[in-house]
């Protein structure tokens, strides 16, 4: 009887075998991070549907939840570079799109 009660307690106690960092979303984010880390330095076309802008960007870095992109801008007598971040959630939902060369 005690063995049965111990097994029942294990089934009801979800914190024992539950790992927050092993959920489906975390596995997806880790996969995307590994994918984008291989693409660092490559050029891509970034399309944002909410602001209706598209830019040619360079992938700078990949982190746990987002990637860092940069693009150059030019003026009459100046030139610069701007960095921006895009979350994996925006890429997965279709709000943003990144087409790598």
From Swiss-Prot:
Signal peptide region:
none
Superkingdom as given in the UniProt entry: Viruses
Q: What is this protein called?
A: Gene 33 protein
Species whose genome carries this gene: Bacillus phage SP01 (Bacteriophage SP01)
């Amino acid at each position: 009887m005690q063995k049965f009660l111990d097994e029942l307690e294990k089934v009801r106690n979800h914190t024992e075998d539950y790992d927050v960092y092993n959920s489906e979303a975390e596995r997806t984010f880790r996969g995307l991070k590994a994918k984008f880390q291989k693409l660092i330095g490559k050029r891509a076309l970034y399309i944002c549907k909410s602001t209706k802008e598209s830019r040619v960007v360079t992938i700078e870095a990949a982190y746990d939840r987002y990637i860092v992109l940069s693009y150059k801008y030019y003026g009459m007598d100046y030139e610069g570079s701007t960095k921006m971040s895009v979350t994996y959630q925006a890429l997965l939902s279709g709000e943003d799109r990144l087409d790598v060369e």
